[in-house]
């Protein structure tokens, strides 16, 4: 298999796009609710990347509770009944949207308080004309690929929408939300610049990748990569032996130099394919 260069220098900053969002300046879903908030706002979030983005913008001013445990498959997650109590107390409920968390969205709509607001970040940020349908998210199923946050630009757009919503609810802390957003944006911009600079040395036609989970469609579209395939099938189960064999053939025929794994979906299949 032809390799453009030792791809560790390319893989690391690319995977850092996910790491940036998951860590979001050091915060994670478990720690987000720890500070004593100054605003009194209670915010509910769904998946860990969104929890982290909200925590990065909110700082210590907001109580944040994530509903989807970190490391959980959000595509198959069903909220526990006790999540209804949290949703009933939340002033703002941030979800990704784009059909990712429909069970949680339904629970939120049924239980939110009268002045509580549900904000579907991806649905607001992404025009329908820019929806990506692919091998894991076929258009006939009506669910676009929802993974905007692995692209730094979309992560910034999420953070800016969070900033606006928090500032509207808590104008006394608007300046801090703005400052936190600007710090987040600076890190995301730095990451994007590093990725573009790094991949500039890759020979033409070699910007191809295979992922375990189909989470890089928007990143690939914005950075000029081609996602050849994903190891995990659209059912989100482990691939069958025949599916693995077919993907290996595809990787070899396409000359794919890069395979991205996932902390959320660890799998021994990666080593077999690589």
Stretches with model-predicted labels:
Residues 1-23:
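Sec-dependent bacterial lipoprotein signal peptides
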Residues 3, 24-274:
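Extracytoplasmic metal-acquisition and chelation regions
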